[in-house]
């Protein structure tokens, strides 16, 4: 999640520790190493060079929190936990529709990263823009009502948005939905209209952000499972439930989604750098899936920690 959403950033990140480990990235094992088999399906990154990669809406370097979270800094945290590949998510608050830094990361490390980018559905030919970004490693697109101040209720009905969904059915680029529980019925309708479009719902549709796991919200999320190309990111633990490790209160929700979608349509993700703020940390996030949930088989864990994200995002 990012600064567009009203979630409190409780504390600044421990950037010094991140920077210390980043120097080891250049000598790290290959992405397909047995030591780093897992995929983090959702992390943001940004550089401190705001002159080279300008921020939107008049923001300056002082607005970055943390001041730097580069791909090297991310991998310095991820690799010790067995994560060798990451799906990088465009930060709508800092760079919005300018995907340049993420594209640069893929250019430098084409085997390690894929991108969920953003295009402006209010501009002409967003479908053409999507197709142009596919060879650059952009295999999904973040769509969200939170960037729209006008026509918020109709965000899925705009012609450009409909074009994006149609294009995704052609290219396999996923529509990655950053939404609230109240947005689930609208997304469900779009899945009905575009049954061949891959759809990923981020962060459990933010169920539990207020500490409550409402049955009606979970029913609406599980209802989406009837569309065969939908999958769920089980992610952003820092923002849900008790919002602190060991995150065990999320297990009943994960089990319910496991029963509705099956392991082949669930994927773990950290939502860094926000998962490493305050009392939260990267290890606690991946450990919930890797080490703690007893109803998962070894093969299930392969899907949640690697195969689903590989299938959805690393196809090109």
Which residue ranges define each predicted feature?
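Short, glycine/acidic-enriched loop or turn micro-motifs at the edges of active sites
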Residues: 43-45, 206, 274
């Amino acid at each position: 999640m990012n600064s567009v959403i009203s979630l409190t950033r409780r504390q600044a990140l421990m950037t010094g520790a991140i920077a210390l480990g980043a120097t080891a990235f250049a000598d790290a094992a290959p992405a397909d190493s047995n030591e780093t088999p897992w995929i983090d399906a959702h992390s943001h990154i940004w550089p401190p060079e705001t002159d080279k990669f300008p921020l939107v809406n008049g923001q300056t370097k002082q607005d970055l929190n943390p001041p730097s979270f580069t791909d090297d800094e991310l991998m310095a945290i991820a690799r010790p936990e067995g994560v060798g590949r990451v799906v990088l998510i465009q930060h709508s608050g800092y760079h919005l529709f300018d995907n340049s830094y993420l594209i640069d990361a893929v250019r430098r490390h084409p085997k390690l990263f894929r991108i969920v980018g953003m295009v402006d559905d209010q501009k002409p030919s967003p479908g053409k823009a999507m197709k142009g970004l596919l060879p650059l490693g952009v295999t999904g697109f973040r769509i969200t009502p939170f960037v729209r101040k006008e026509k918020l209720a109709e965000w899925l009905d705009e012609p450009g948005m409909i074009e994006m969904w149609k294009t995704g059915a052609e290219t396999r680029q996923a529509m990655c939905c950053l939404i609230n529980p109240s947005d689930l019925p609208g997304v469900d309708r779009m899945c009905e209209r575009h049954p061949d479009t891959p759809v990923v719902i981020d962060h459990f549709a933010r169920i539990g952000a207020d500490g409550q796991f409402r049955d009606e919200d979970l029913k609406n999320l599980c209802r989406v499972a009837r569309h065969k190309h939908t999958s769920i990111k089980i992610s952003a633990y820092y923002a849900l439930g008790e919002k602190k490790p060991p995150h065990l209160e999320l297990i009943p929700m994960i089990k319910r989604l496991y029963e509705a979608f099956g392991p082949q349509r669930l994927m773990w993700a950290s939502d860094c750098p926000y998962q490493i703020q305050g009392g939260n940390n990267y290890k606690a996030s991946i450990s919930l899936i890797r080490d703690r949930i007893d109803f998962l088989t070894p093969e299930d864990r392969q899907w949640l920690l690697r195969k689903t994200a590989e299938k959805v995002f690393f196809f090109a």
